[in-house]
Structures are given as structure tokens and as C-alpha cells.
Amino acid sequence: MLDVAIIGCGVIGAAAAYELSHYPLQTAIFEAENDVADCTTKANSAILHAGYDPEPGTRMARLNVEGSALAKEICARLDVPYLQCGSLVLALSPEELPHLQKLYENGIANGVPGIRLLSAEETLAMEPNLAPTVVGALYAPSAAIVSPWEFALAMAEVAVRNGVELHRSCPVTRIEKTAGGWALTTPSGIVETRYIINAAGISAQAVHDMAAPHKFTIQPTRGEYYLLDKSEGSRVHHVIFQCPNENGKGVLVAPTVHGNLIVGPNADPVEGDDTACTAAGLAFVSAAARRSVPNIRFSESIRNFAGVRANVDTGDFVIGEAEGAPGFIDLAGMKSPGLSSAPAVAREAVKILEAHGDLPAPKADYRDGRTRVRFKELPPEEKARLIAKEPAYGRVICRCETITEGEILDALHEEIPATTIDGVKRRCGAGMGRCQGGFCGPRVLELISKTLGISPLDVLQDKAGTNVLLCETKQEENHHD
């Protein structure tokens, strides 16, 4: 029997696994998709928020500030791309200045460090490409940007290294109460566990309702984005927000840790995991963004994408044991600032186990830490040494991002190995650049096929059913005249 079963391995499930892996518990993760971080965690704004937006006294307010500080430490320890660039919330008219004052007061109450109000002149001095109509801004120096999928992957990898089991393509379809805890029905059979952590993202309501009386409703909400080429990456140097409204923090413009510019999102209620991009949605995003940064060159867009976030009707994170279901722990409704809060949210689950007296002493032999080979960032002498040791690092496969064969092979041999083309992209960046895999994609497919010992026809782009190749069009034949 398991001690803890975690349902879902986005950033919340990965953070929970990372925290629990510090203890001698039998813990397993059950992820419905074929990879970690393959839903909301891979398609969001990639912001670690400072914490001025949530209403004081809410879980969001406390866990946002705590989580962002913990995330900074974890990213440093696990070699995850992170940059504390700060954020600006703009007032684009005098009528919006009272809203900035309210956010400032929230920030003070929530313990956000270094937060202050700026004049129009101070704001434009920091970001000269902003609209000249700016009348002021709220500056939060603790806001940061991160690679969200690498953040989740890193925590999940360290958890697996320390004994947590990960079951991919393994949805939980039924939950039943037993004398000793819970029984989960999965494609690989019945799994018994003492505790369940519900970290199922937009599916968290459905998972909760399998085990306990209905308590909350999640409305999946789609947000569409532009990702612009690195030629636009320095258009702004801070995360640029407009004044938020009831639909969220509005359309932002921000640098990314990879050197691009990200613009979005809108907020459209959808059914399920509908990540289609729409002409109307993208037109709204570009028009809204130009209110903040008029000279963005959307002609430099290299990709449009959409993510779905879990808007919940409680107005706050849903955290705790479900009523009438002891041992079933919800970590649900993780809309923004869910990414920022993830490490602190995970610790809330650990506290529940501790309160029940079911948290043993931490492991003495815990193996923390993680390093990555990022070939293009190495000094020349280190590149030469690495190539001499492993010639695959001398063969550049992705020319846009200067990603080598060695890095792709690393992605295919990690604690949680990539099994798809997008899985490789999320781990090492191959296909992330200007051509979006147009040149390197076939070579990545070939390496996946060879390394995993599967037919090229079985290699997926991402989720189940996204086979890149459908059939062979030519076969070698011997012709004799």
C-alpha cells in the first residue's frame, strides 16, 4: 500500500512530490498525460508574481509571497532558468491611479518586499518603450520570470531520484474509500493508498467529486499568447501589466528567460482542455498589448499558443482535506498565482500529514540538487573538454537555439526521460527557436526512434495521437535491369 498517491504532475503535483520525497514515505504520482507539465504548466505566462494582487487574508495572498521566495531558492538549487526582473503595473489614465493605490496597499499588507508607486517620468525612464499615456505605475522588484515546465520537471526528477514512483499515461478513473484509506482505479490496476493529493489542475473538480461531496466548480479558462522572436526580447525589461480586472491580471508583455518576448493572455471560458488559438482572441491580445507597448512588432511572432487555467468559483485556492473524506487532500483551483505559490502549496499538504502524525523524520541520505548541460552557455575551453569526452556535444542539431545532439540524448536519458518531440523541446530547447523545429524536428525524431527503439511512425509530437509520420512513402528495393 502507498502512503501517498498524487494525482497530477503539473507544477503543483511536482512540488508536492518534491516535498514528500524528503521523507521515507511510499509516494507515487499518477499523471494522465504522457509527460510531466503537459497541461497548464507548459502554457502560461511564466511569471513568479510578487504578491500584491491577491486580497489580504486569503490563501493566495500568503502562499504567493511564500511560494515566490521558495521558488527562487529551488530554481537556484535545481538549475532552473530564473530571472528576478521585477514588474510594473501601469495606470494608463488618471482614473486607474486609485487602483494602483489599492494594489500597493494589498502589497504592503501581504508583505511584498520593496514595492513602491512610480510617477509617469520614473516609469518611462525604466521602460522607454511604454505608451506615452502612462500616468504612473506600481513597481514590484521581487517579481520574476521562470521556465515553468523546467521548474516542474526539475522538482519531479529529484523526487523520482529519491524514490517517488511516476506513472505516466495513467489516469485515475475511479476512487473508492476502503478500511485502510483509498483505492484508485488506473489502467494498470487497483492501487491502494492511505492519502490522496488531488493536484489534477483543470480536472481537480472531477477528481474531488469521485471521493467527496461536490464542493467547488472549476471553469476551464483559455488564455491565448504570442511568442515573439528574440529580436523583440529586449522591447521591455520588466513584466508589464495593465490594471487587473475580474478576469485576471490582463494582457501582459514580458521578457522570457530564453530571451523571447511573450504577450498575452485573454480569458475565454471553454469546455475541457480546449487550447485552440482563435483569430478573434489573438486580435484582442495584440490590440490590448499595444495599449501598454505600442511599438511591439507582432510580425516577429514565431508561435501562437494557448493554455487553460483552472478558474474556481471559491475565489481562492482550495486546499485541505475534503469534507467527509479523511485523507483526501485537495490542492485545487490553482489559477494565477498558482505557479508562484506552488512550493508553498506543497508544504500545506505536508503540514496535513504532520497534523495527523503521519510524517516521519526526514531522510538522512536525501539527494537534492540538479545540473544541466547548456552547451551554448559554456566557455570555449569547457566546450572543447565536453566534446573530447562525448563527441555528440560537438554536433549541433537545433541551429536556432544551438542545441547539440549530446543535450538531446541527455533529455532522452534523464530520471524522467523525454518520449516525444515536444518532451525533448521542454527539456533542452531543441525546436524552441525561430523555425520552431522546421529544420531540427526530423533529426530529433530520428534520435528518439533510435534511442527508444521504436519505429519512426510511433514517435509523437506531444500528446497521444500526434504521430508526426503516418506511413512510409518509399522503401528500398533492389532493381535489376
Question: Which residue stretches match the model-derived regions?
Answer:
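N-terminal Rossmann-like FAD-binding beta1-loop-alpha1 element of flavoenzymes
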Residues: L2-A28
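Flavin-dependent oxidoreductases
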Residues: A15, I175-G180, L184-G264, D268-T278, ...
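Glycine-rich FAD pyrophosphate-binding loop
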Residues: H22-K42
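Dinucleotide-binding Rossmann-like beta1-alpha1 core, especially the glycine-rich loop
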Residues: A46-M126, G250-V251
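Short beta-strand to alpha-helix junction loop
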Residues: R62-V65, L90-H99, L138-E157, T275-A280, ...
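Helical element adjacent to the flavin cofactor pocket in flavoenzyme catalytic cores
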Residues: L138-Y195
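C-terminal catalytic lobe of FAD-dependent flavoproteins
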Residues: G248, V257-H258, D273-V396, I403-I416, ...
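Iron-sulfur (Fe-S) cluster-binding segments and ferredoxin-like electron-carrier domains
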Residues: T404-E415, G438-P456
